[in-house]
Amino acid sequence: MTELRPFYEESQSIYDVSDEFFSLFLDPTMAYTCAYFEREDMTLEEAQNAKFDLALDKLHLEPGMTLLDIGCGWGGGLQRAIENYDVNVIGITLSRNQFEYSKAKLAKIPTERSVQVRLQGWDEFTDKVDRIVSIGAFEAFKMERYAAFFERSYDILPDDGRMLLHTILTYTQKQMHEMGVKVTMSDVRFMKFIGEEIFPGGQLPAQEDIFKFAQAADFSVEKVQLLQQHYARTLNIWAANLEANKDRAIALQSEEIYNKYMHYLTGCEHFFRKGISNVGQFTLTK
């Protein structure tokens, strides 16, 4: 098999703007993925922790298990797993900022369990683990590597292994037509903007892709849970937070970066409300 090299440069260009800039619109968990508003009155922080619980509960974690978080971000999911599920954790990320931030954050949590954060891609990871969670990282993996990703994940899990994959989803033109979703030239321009300015190298899967590649690696898809309007609400809050911190954001970065992120957050909210984009959690079992 050809050796795969992680896309470090792409990931670092996306996430290594500055931790403080992201903290202006994210909640204290620093989760940069769709929240789960289990109750209408939830704060963003409560909804992000509810999202982590929603994902982790599907893994049937038991004390002492080892959980791998692929694309662990700023460590919010790892922290939740350590504090609420009493497991050993390994988080991997391609972002140096996220790696340093997560290491420092998790070092402050009292636990008898093993806690590791690595600057490493899934394609370099070969340790055996009991469970895998990946929230908002799959979008950067590229379709030509989907097969290898699911095969690697399957190989490092035990016979009763479980994996939770949380990813943004797209639809084919045919599906959008059937759903009555009309894609305008403005929508097409926004897609181009996202691909060039915000997530260079990103590629969104369709639900069918997850089924096809996961099942080809011998996973069973136990459950799919879509969270489309939860992401629209998350993005709405992020945009409001960033707008409220406009002066600080410009001081930290620039007016150009501030405007770029406002355009991105408001445009993505529109995509989720309109039905162009979706987001789902896929529970995979061996």
UniProtKB/Swiss-Prot annotation:
InterPro entries assigned to the protein according to its UniProt record, in alphabetical order: CFA/CMAS, CMAS, CMAS_actinobact, SAM-dependent_MTases_sf
Gene behind the chain: umaA
Biological process, per Gene Ontology: lipid biosynthetic process; methylation
**Do the record's keywords include Cytoplasm?**
yes
Give the protein family.
Belongs to the CFA/CMAS family.
Which EC number(s) does the record attach to this protein? 2.1.1.-
Q: Where does S-adenosyl-L-methionine bind?
A: 32-33, 67-75, 93-98, 122-123
Coarse class of the primary localization is cytoplasm
Q: Which PANTHER family match?
A: CYCLOPROPANE-FATTY-ACYL-PHOSPHOLIPID SYNTHASE (PTHR43667:SF1)
| Keywords associated with the record | Cytoplasm, Lipid metabolism, Methyltransferase, S-adenosyl-L-methionine, Transferase
Q: Briefly, what is this protein's role? A: Methyltransferase that modifies short-chain fatty acids. In vitro, catalyzes the transfer of the methyl group from S-adenosyl-L-methionine (SAM) to the double bond of phospholipid-linked oleic acid to produce tuberculostearic acid (10-methylstearic-acid or TSA).
Q: Name one GO cellular component term.
A: plasma membrane
Q: Which NCBIfam families does the entry mention?
A: mycolic_MTase (NF040660)
Could you tell me the superkingdom of the organism this chain comes from?
Bacteria
Compartmental location: Cytoplasm
User: Which residues participate directly in catalysis?
Assistant: 268
Taken from the record, one Pfam family name reads: CMAS
Q: Name one GO molecular function term.
A: cyclopropane-fatty-acyl-phospholipid synthase activity
Top-level EC class: transferase
Annotated source species: Mycobacterium tuberculosis (strain ATCC 25618 / H37Rv)
What's this protein's name?
Answer: S-adenosylmethionine-dependent methyltransferase UmaA
